[in-house]
Amino acid sequence: MALELALDLQFAVNPGNLPTEAEFETWVRVALGDTLDEAELTIRIVDATESQQLNRDYRGKDKPTNVLSFPFEAPPGMELPLLGDLVICASVVENEALEQHKALEAHWAHMVVHGCLHLLGYDHIDDAEAEEMEALETTLLTGLGYPDPYKEQ
């Protein structure tokens, strides 16, 4: 059965140089795979100021970051398709792509996949979790035709 996806894209920056809605949807669908029958999530594209504020308020890090994930936790006994929210900072993604010599589209795909995996419960706090998450990201992204995001460019 195909994933029934409700994707809410919010642009708090000029969407001129950003991926298309179709690209975002493709990346989300690939990241979620066949783990769910239906899912709802929001992806908000923000500037460095908003990213820094959220990163400071929720993670205690006073700097903008590439992607923040906010998983939705349903009350016990309630089954809801809400996955949560991703907040992606456009300028950080662009700067990282330049610094790391990556194609901008490939880095956007990586950030969306990475964030979605966090919403599914993956993490990279310890080495074993990081290896598992990075291996899955690499498999998903190379399956889309992008290079391994963890390989030196």
Swiss-Prot record:
Zn(2+) binds at H114, H118, H124. Pfam families: YbeY. Keywords: Cytoplasm, Endonuclease, Hydrolase, Metal-binding, Nuclease, Ribosome biogenesis, rRNA processing, Zinc. Signal peptide: none annotated. Its main location: cytoplasm. Its cofactor is Zn(2+). The keyword Cytoplasm applies. GO terms for biological process: rRNA processing. It is found in: Cytoplasm. Its EC number is 3.1.-.-. One of its GO terms (molecular function) is zinc ion binding. Binds 1 zinc ion. It comes from the Bacteria. One of its GO terms (cellular component) is cytoplasm. Belongs to the endoribonuclease YbeY family. PANTHER family: ENDORIBONUCLEASE YBEY, CHLOROPLASTIC (PTHR46986:SF1). Single strand-specific metallo-endoribonuclease involved in late-stage 70S ribosome quality control and in maturation of the 3' terminus of the 16S rRNA. This is Endoribonuclease YbeY.
